[in-house]
Amino acid sequence: MNILKDKINKEGIVIDNRILRVDMFLNHQLDIELLNEIGKEFKNRFKDKEINKILTVETSGIGIACVVAQYFNNVPVVFAKKHAGSNMGENVYESKVYSFTKDIEYTIKVSKDYIDKEDNILIIDDFLASGSAMSGLIDIAEKSGAIVEGVGIVIEKEFQKGRKIILNKGIQLESLAIIKGFEDNKVVFK
């Protein structure tokens, strides 16, 4: 997706040839025009799927997922919580995930009230790197009996193992910008 790659090249900041900051348009401040283009692109790539729910993980995926949902007939968006409050109760699906950026393991949780075997889920997130968050979301969906129709990623770090993990599960993966690596603190796209 050229508009996304251009935005990454113009505004993204690479730190230590390993971390890409895009918080200025994707996961802190949101560029709504760009998110609408992302939503259209995911709709095009998953147009043959009968999606009735979008699943993501807090917090960076929520804004993206909400815009994407508008292109799938305003289906509900469910997000896995990293820090479930006492009002969530114990009737939850949960899975452990590791955050590459924060170097922390979380237990993510989704209430059993919001996903079940009737759901055809599209998982949406901002980044795919090690695949831990996606594995956790897929695990939660599978525990609920839902069908994971696909995974939509805005930016993928191809040089990490996330892609392989998802494809080995037989799930359609669509990434809008795929990064081969970093050189001299610049992004190298596939």
Swiss-Prot record:
GO terms for biological process: purine ribonucleoside salvage; xanthine metabolic process; XMP salvage. The keyword Glycoprotein does not apply. Gene3D superfamilies: 3.40.50.2020. GO terms for molecular function: xanthine phosphoribosyltransferase activity. It comes from the Bacteria. It is found in: Cytoplasm. Pathway: Purine metabolism; XMP biosynthesis via salvage pathway; XMP from xanthine: step 1/1. Its EC number is 2.4.2.22. One of its GO terms (cellular component) is cytoplasm. InterPro entries: PRibTrfase_dom, PRTase-like, Pur/Pyrimidine_PRTase, Xanthine_PRibTrfase. 5-phospho-alpha-D-ribose 1-diphosphate binds at A129, S130, G131, S132, A133. CDD domains: PRTases_typeI. It holds the Pfam family Pribosyltran. Xanthine binds at L20, N27, K157. The keyword Glycosyltransferase applies. Keywords: Cytoplasm, Glycosyltransferase, Purine salvage, Transferase. It catalyses: XMP + diphosphate = xanthine + 5-phospho-alpha-D-ribose 1-diphosphate. Disulfide bonds: none annotated. PANTHER family: HYPOXANTHINE/GUANINE PHOSPHORIBOSYLTRANSFERASE (PTHR43864), XANTHINE PHOSPHORIBOSYLTRANSFERASE (PTHR43864:SF1). Converts the preformed base xanthine, a product of nucleic acid breakdown, to xanthosine 5'-monophosphate (XMP), so it can be reused for RNA or DNA synthesis. Belongs to the purine/pyrimidine phosphoribosyltransferase family. Xpt subfamily. Homodimer. This is Xanthine phosphoribosyltransferase.
